Curated annotation (Swiss-Prot):
Catalyzes the NAD(P)-dependent oxidation of 4-(phosphooxy)-L-threonine (HTP) into 2-amino-3-oxo-4-(phosphooxy)butyric acid which spontaneously decarboxylates to form 3-amino-2-oxopropyl phosphate (AHAP). This is 4-hydroxythreonine-4-phosphate dehydrogenase. It comes from Yersinia pseudotuberculosis serotype O:1b (strain IP 31758). Coiled coil: none annotated. The lineage of its organism: Bacteria, Pseudomonadati, Pseudomonadota, Gammaproteobacteria, Enterobacterales. The gene is pdxA. It comes from the Bacteria.
Amino acid sequence: MHNHNNRLVITPGEPAGVGPDLAIALAQQDWPVELVVCADPALLLARASQLNLPLQLREYQADQPAIAQQAGSLTILPVKTAVNVVPGKLDVGNSHYVVETLAKACDGAISGEFAALVTGPVQKSIINDAGIPFIGHTEFFADRSHCQRVVMMLATEELRVALATTHLPLLAVPGAITQASLHEVITILDNDLKTKFGITQPQIYVCGLNPHAGEGGHMGHEEIDTIIPALNTLRQQGINLIGPLPADTLFQPKYLQHADAVLAMYHDQGLPVLKYQGFGRAVNITLGLPFIRTSVDHGTALELAATGTADVGSFITALNLAIKMINNSNE
């Protein structure tokens, strides 16, 4: 294992939210890797004292070998906030700060300095209010690493759900599903299940778009015109695909027990099942990037900032999965 492969970068996200609290909570235990937090050191130290938790920071040095993180400490890649942070109060003045932390962490992950990037929650609305067009982390990282196509996947211990389309109005979904887009999404999904999850022959179950997967064309034509031909082409390339199946059929234990991943056609087709089954234990993963990226599955929880009641479970799960994916990639 290379030294830098033992180094993960973390972006706590929105400074007024629970992200800084969670970064400090992560620091309260030992980790087998070095955790480099891209944030304002003054923000973390102030929040740690508000939470009454011990925190020592050491400045990140790229030329030094990675060290396993000891409880009570974090390595810091510093970016300064523009205005004073009040826990629970959004300030448009710090939007550029948030984006700068993402850019710095992303560049380090692209260059291979960091083996993985783990993100805390950002407040999309306040970034956009600052005049910075921002759809989400996924799109930001894709753009910055010049990836034409990435895939959003959420995972729990028992279930992985990838999305054929992500943050689109429902009205725009059918037009966004083409044979070409399905080809790209499924190829990335299959490849990353092999390389980052260590699954030699992934079985991917695919949802139809319409109720009853179109009922043979009586309830929509997307399955017949687009989804089935795309799956047949991919099967000829050796990808193991089952479907399209009606989503309400597919999300039953008898099918899911054989699925390495489920491909849902749109955001709210696949994610409610997964969230119900594993909220707080789910991890958001971006597939198709030139680096490993995992994320918490919750928002900024402004009302919990600096209260000491924020749950670090999702962040720990996201970190542990990133470490597992690094190990799979190195094998």
